Amino acid sequence: MQLQQIIYNFGTNFTLKKGMLGIRYERVDPEYKTLGAYYFNNDFENITLNAAFNLLKDKLSLQTNIGRQRDNLQNQKGKQTSRWVGTVNANFQASDKLMITASYSNFTMFTNNQLNQFNNINNNPLQIQQPRDSIQYRQISQNVNININYALSATKEKAQNININYSLNDMVNKEDGIVRRGGISRFHNANINYNISFPERKMNIAASINYTNTYAASQYTNIIGPSISFNKGILKDKMQISSGASYNISSGRGIRTSVFNFRAGASYAPWEKHNFDLNIINMFRLTNQNIPHPKMNEITCTVGYNYRF
């Protein structure tokens, strides 16, 4: 006798004085068929919890979400997968000038290839190094981001702000609790940006320094360098001119490379539907790598015309 395959999907939210709590449950039985979105997606169960709160006189807002998904609900498959997903977001308005945001997310996946029980019974217990036909696989991915923005000044004549940002991406792959060679990858990025604008002059200047550290395939790579840019509107804002320069040094695996870029461009719109563009990029590269051209100077020039119908 074949049991009827059904689907469940329900949830509720509880409103609090300074926040909210919610829960949702979703289940789709194996071999459930419909003409809707679940035709190709069945045999899974989702449980999700979420919450949001406003604290410190509404200066701090917190949002969090955690959920679990699993398949193989009736143990009919040779493999079972479960996933955990969690996120936390925070926004803190410390003052009229200072804003801090932070976020964290975690994705964890477990996969178990189930053993054939008859193989376990029939295996000779004296053969200690019996080949395994089951692997417990786990993948953990974590992301962190922190952003700090501070407004130095804000007037009609001049506006200044400084921004600091840091991000991390970390991924680990495990087999039977063991991290194999190359099973870890980690990415760090940090940058500081300074921006000053003169609204009445239609002019903006920005400067930044960026640092990146990457660990992948058991190797480290570092990249660091500053950049600066300039933008201004002229001819009653019909023309926009811009220029910029950047320099970075990368090192890793015994290779060191330095790159310098200079950019200049202009955009001119003499009439409402017509636009002309001119951009020039000059790149200098120097490396100690054993390649045919360790020193390179490249110039790229593009000219464009655009008509809007």
Language-model features: locations:
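Exposed, low-structure sequence patches enriched in small/polar residues
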Residues: M1-F309
